[in-house]
Amino acid sequence: MKRRIWASVGMTVMGSVLLVAAMFAGTAAGGTAATDARAGGTLRIVSSSDFDYVDPALSYFSHSWNMMGATQLTLLYYPHKEGPVGRRLSPMAAQGMPRVSNGGKTYTFTIKRGFKFSNGTNVTAANFKRAFDRALNKAMGSPGSSFLDDVARYRTIGTYQFQVTLKKVAPDFLARMSMQFFSAVPTNTPFTAEGIKAPVVSAGPYYLKEWNAKTSALVVRNPHWKNNQQPFRSLGFQNNINEFRWIVGPAPATQRLMCERGEADICSFPPAQAKELADAHGINRQRFFVKSQTVLWYLVMNNSRGIFQNNVNLRKAVSHAIDRRFMVAQHGYLAGQRTDQFLPYSMPGFRNFNIYSLKGPNYAAARRLAQGNTRNGQAVMYTFNVAQGPPIAQSVQFNLKQIGVDVEIRQFDRVVQNEKSGTRGEPFDLTLEGWGMDYPDPSNFINVLLDGRRIQADHNVNVSYFNNAAINRRMDRANSLSGQARLQAYGILDRDIMRDHAPLAPYISTNARIFTSNTVGCYGYTSIQGSLLTQICKR
């Protein structure tokens, strides 16, 4: 999954809502007090796997976007603060919320004066127009293009106004403007399918100075960001840390040791060790944090090829046959709740319909549905090669064997797995995925991950390749609504998709968990941003 695909548990613990890492941090009363803070220092973050891209037009992994939360400047943002204020969409580069005209279809943003890129150039409306240009450029294949498919036109007006006109009213448009795809970029940023490389010029409080693929990354201060001056001061960033260093490659068990020995500051750990860490350090005190997040993990079935294409009964059989209890256990202590629905428990609009078994496999129902529908009985499953990936794949292999399907497991680095499954025509039948919200709206799960009209050649997040015309129309209707009617429509749509079409099999709505060194202070987390890099400090 891209932001938001979630990384595997061992991949990173910094992401929020891009493809998902299942072990993120949480914060609560009892965390390290801000009075323990000191400005400066280096924060070392360990990850089993690398960023997908460092180009905001292409990146969509949770931990990549978490890094970009400290480096990018968007028109609007969700404040880097815990509690209700962190879920309230607010102006960032914009002077205020945009002026709305043309029956709710035209938005005019006025850009604050004073923001500068890390190379010293001024941020203007043209920098946001360039971000739109790149997201919509077909040669780039940006995942951001699908979030602009209802844009009729966009333009700059003078130096500091940016205007967007939609084809139809879209209640979630402003929330989309908080996404990293649409952050300010220099007007000469090239169109390249491979993405730009470090150093990445950006207009947030930090910028990416170095990126050594599969090895390390370095993020340092933007010298032109002045916390105590406007327009910067109103955003409330602390920016305590001088530089962030990412260390890529160590396995989860090694990461834990690195944090315990003071060789790193934010680390993952084997899922089986979560209980031990909680017992040793307590929960939400200083070093081991647990927090609810809007993240879902699920088993994807490829609806475009092989044994699951036009085979809804076999897809339903899989949802009955998998062992959600065992799968959730592989995520470890306090990992989350079992689920059989696509909207996470904490997503507005969620309603519990109890469609499939949350206890163990229902082989009787699964076999009835599978009978006569297994075709050649062969399936290829992709998974990642760390943490919960291998044991969950083996569980699926065993469960599906009981209904007449032989599963061949192929393991990859998480980034490679995602690149493969996101390529249309890739020869897989099953893949293990996780997704976290970009913004708190049910369309960010259902429309983003299941609207088949958004499928492109590569960089897909709809890796089930589900494309149902009737469901697409219902998504459009739900997305045109607002308020309680919108949430009710999406709740029923969730039920009907899972009950009647079963393009994938959800199994856990997760918590965030994170382990830190004893020198980390001011730790904060939100379900939108993930770990708050602009607020964290060293003690």
Q: Where would I find each of the regions flagged by the language model?
A:
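Ligand-site clamp/hinge motif
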Residues: 225-277, 406
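Periplasmic-binding protein-like
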Residues: 55, 308-348, 391-392, 497-506
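N-terminal lobe/hinge region of extracytoplasmic solute-binding protein
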Residues: 46-102, 133, 201
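Gly/Pro-rich hinge or "lid" segments in bacterial periplasmic/extracellular proteins
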Residues: 79-84, 178-243
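Surface-exposed binding/hinge segments that line
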Residues: 38, 110, 144-189, 194, ...
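Structural transition elements
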Residues: 206-207, 336-371, 386-391
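Extracytoplasmic/peripheral linker and loop segments enriched in polar/acidic and small residues
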Residues: 36, 316, 328, 406-419, ...
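Long beta-strand-rich cores associated with HINT superfamily self-processing modules
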Residues: 514-539
